Amino acid sequence: MRIALTGNPNSGKTTMYNALTGRNEKIGNWAGVTVDKKEYPVKKDHYDGSLELIAVDLPGAYSMSPFTSEESITSGYVKNEHPDAIINIVDATNLSRSLFFTTQLLELGVPVVVALNKSDINEKKGNKIDEKTLSEKLGCPVIKTTSTTDTGLREVVKKAAELQGAGQKPPYVQGDINLHDKKEVEAADRKRFEFVNAIVKQVETRKVLTKEKNAGDKIDAVLTNPVSGIITVSYTHLRAHETCA
């Protein structure tokens, strides 16, 4: 059984892959289309069931749109190689930004488990995420994890193994759009961002910072704003597509 590990850059994805497999892969995003995917059996420390589990470390990506080399590798593997399950590593400290990608993965028909990673850091900041409600809204399991301490890894792997062959109803379906039409892409991204942000408002409680926002919050505010987020993500995708054309 092959389990694809997906997530935004710097979500802790490769740290989780190393923990699950005992490997020591370089932590960082893949560079260039010539780099092959990484895959290795999951250690018995994290799974003692009857299945042979192979973890596949895919490049960090913000979207399933294949406009960058990293996104192309990730999108191509999930769509063409048909992994048995996906562990989507979501950065708990940047929930809105991460869930844009999550909702795209849930449209593909492959069972998804969300690993709500860096939960320890998020809680130290005074923030809270209701993972039970988030699971209900997404229609998939959500498990808190901390890759650096192995917290939650056995649970997330066990759940992924249990989901083999299971069906999941996607919470959001975009439909076909013309990727060459900037206005159409922006409109589609706007709707997805609005859907994601509506979920986040229901499940996340953030500690109010009285003096200034930290750098991550500032970036998150730009990327998940219904207007600026569209400009940032869509423009980057379109420019990358034009360059490759």
Model-flagged regions — what are they?
Residues 1-56:
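Conserved G1/Walker A P-loop phosphate-binding module
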Residues 53-66:
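Switch II (G3) loop of P-loop NTPases
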Residues 77-81, 85-140:
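Conserved C-terminal guanine-recognition region of P-loop GTPase G domains, centered on the G4
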Residues 123-169:
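Canonical P-loop GTPase G-domain recognition
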Residues 167-200:
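Short, non-transmembrane cytosolic segments of multipass membrane proteins
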Residues 203-216:
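Short, membrane-interfacial amphipathic segments enriched in basic
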Residues 222-226, 230:
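Loop-to-transmembrane-helix entry motif
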Residues 237-245:
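Single conserved hydrophobic/aromatic residue that forms the stacking wall/gate
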